[in-house]
């Protein structure tokens, strides 16, 4: 198999599990908590590092901002054998009890973006794998930091949200808004 055109990797070079932050700068910081970190590739917004965290081999791959670039990364990671994707990053809280530094574990994502419509009908919910979701909730609850579990929103217009739009999401019970989770859930 040839190298993937955007990630510049091929089968056998990556771990089965990938952390997928949007920001390449996070790919530089996450290995500070790991051992044996090694840069595998870097192209455009995509930076890939293999590392070991507490005995678990993993790959860290930035996706850039938004669902389109995340979908490219996820498609190419899956093509070379990555099986589990864990999104790590920032989000905008929609509920007053969520504070900076809290952990949010998404049980699903309202699809308010265009990428997922190319993969399935918009009526199909974007939900994570239940086994991965359960493991994340259990791990998050074992930490001393606050954790919030529930549905979120994925949007593709960072500066276009009006107060009314944000209020509607909040009243619907969505925990936060970000720009990649619906694509991750749909593609994974």
Q: Over which residues does each language-model region extend?
A:
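Active-site rim beta-loop-alpha module in soluble metabolic enzymes
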Residues: 123-172
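A residue-level signal for conserved active-site and pocket-lining positions in enzyme catalytic cores
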Residues: 23, 152, 188
């Amino acid at each position: 198999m040839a190298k993937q055109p955007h990630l510049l990797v091929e089968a056998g070079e990556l771990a089965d599990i990938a952390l997928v932050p949007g920001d390449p700068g996070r790919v530089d910081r996450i290995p500070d908590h790991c051992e044996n970190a090694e840069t595998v590739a870097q192209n455009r917004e995509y930076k890939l590092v293999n590392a070991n965290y507490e005995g678990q081999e993993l790959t860290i791959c930035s996706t850039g901002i938004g669902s389109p670039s995340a979908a490219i990364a996820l498609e190419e990671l899956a093509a070379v054998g990555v099986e589990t994707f864990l999104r790590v990053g920032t989000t905008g809280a929609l509920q007053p009890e969520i504070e900076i530094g809290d952990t949010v574990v998404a049980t699903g994502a309202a699809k308010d973006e265009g990428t997922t419509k190319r993969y399935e009908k918009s009526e199909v919910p974007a939900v994570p794998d239940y086994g991965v979701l359960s493991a994340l909730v259990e791990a998050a609850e074992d930490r001393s930091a606050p954790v919030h579990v529930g549905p979120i929103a994925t949007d593709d217009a960072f500066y276009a949200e009006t107060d009314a739009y944000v209020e509607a999401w909040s009243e619907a019970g969505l925990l936060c808004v970000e720009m990649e989770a619906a694509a991750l859930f749909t593609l994974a």
